[in-house]
Amino acid sequence: MEIASRIAGASSYTRAMGVNLPELTLEIFSGSDIDFVLPNDYTVEQDRALYNAYDSNISFSKVYMDYDDTVTCRGKLNDQIIQFIAKCKNHKIPVILLSRHDGDLNTELSNWGITGLFDKVVHMDRKKPKSDFISDKNSIFIDDSFGERKQVKEAVGIPTFEPSMVEFLINRRGF
């Protein structure tokens, strides 16, 4: 027989409505007088799906990434990339932006409010390969361009990722 304190997975629905059942339970057990809850006034439909989690022996101490079609895509910030950058920040892993962006890259970063996310911004000329700017062998490279990833992989020998592959990097156990 198993005895354990736990909450039902479906209680996430009530949290989405603004009612935190575990918190209410703690309040009741601490002697608080709870005679009402404060649900929010909107509709919520819950869809429960599988969540991918990965185990891997990959290790890196620096991230190099592209800007166009990687950090931004179709006129919007790539929220998965931004989430990955935030996780890197939490783990003190520097993120270096390597870009051949047409126009004023610093202004564009400022307009998106993401200037401070990068430890270094390299606005490159189109003639130099990105691998020329990658000095740390214990790093990874993220770019939407297969050609860029291939060139970096061959020149530097580090793991390379297409932007949609960051799900793997975000959902690694222990990261």
What function would you assign to each model-found segment?
Residues 114-117, 137, 154-157:
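Short, structured coil segments at secondary-structure junctions
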Residues 154-175:
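Acidic, PIN/NYN-like endoribonuclease modules and their adjacent C-terminal/linker elements
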Residues 129-147, 152:
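Conserved Lys-Pro-Asp/Glu-containing loop-to-beta segment of HAD-superfamily phosphomonoesterases
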Residues 11-53:
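Active-site "cap" helix and flanking loop/linker of ATP-utilizing ligase/carboxylase catalytic domains
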Residues 41-125:
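Alpha-helical substrate-recognition element adjacent to the catalytic core
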Residues 1-9:
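Conserved metal-phosphate-binding beta-hairpin within the catalytic cores
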Residues 95, 139, 158-160:
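Hydrophobic anchor at the start of a short beta-strand
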Residues 122-128, 146-147, 163-170:
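Short, acidic/turn-prone active-site loops that include or flank metal/cofactor-
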